[in-house]
Amino acid sequence: MNHRFILLAFFCIQIVFGQSFGKNKVQYRDFDWKFIKSPHFDVYYYANEFELAEFTANAAEEAYEQISIHLRWTLKKPVSVIVYNSHNDFQQTNVVDTYMSEGIGGVTELFKNRVVLPFDGSYKEFRHVIHHELVHAVINDMIYGGNIQGIISGRIRLNIPLW
């Protein structure tokens, strides 16, 4: 009986890992990136989306103000926020290796603590996603010192609570 259960569990796990197999990240075009700076963020954008980049920088600063108060933490260095004009362009990102399905509204990359966001046309939803992803970025800064490279090189000691 136990052997059947183990065999069934093994095949179920293989099915879960097989969902992303064969999904390639195709990059249809090259992006001409520009960026603007705010006190705590470097916002990268492309095409003629300066207004979207300004909105992103302002929304990020507003969100950071709330997050830093709630978590009692200030960022050690500016966080890069990469903004794509559409979800189709967002799916081409090479910041993370994972295929970005339609349901993903943004991602915070741990290695360099970068936030990657697609703009879907709704400023209200975009502001919400910016806030959500910046919570991840601030927590990464709290735990890993801004990037995981410091832990790998041994420069940062983890002081995780032992609850």
List the predicted regions and their residue ranges.
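Bacterial Sec-dependent N-terminal signal peptides
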Residues: 1-26
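Juxtacatalytic substrate-recognition/specificity segment
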Residues: 18-159
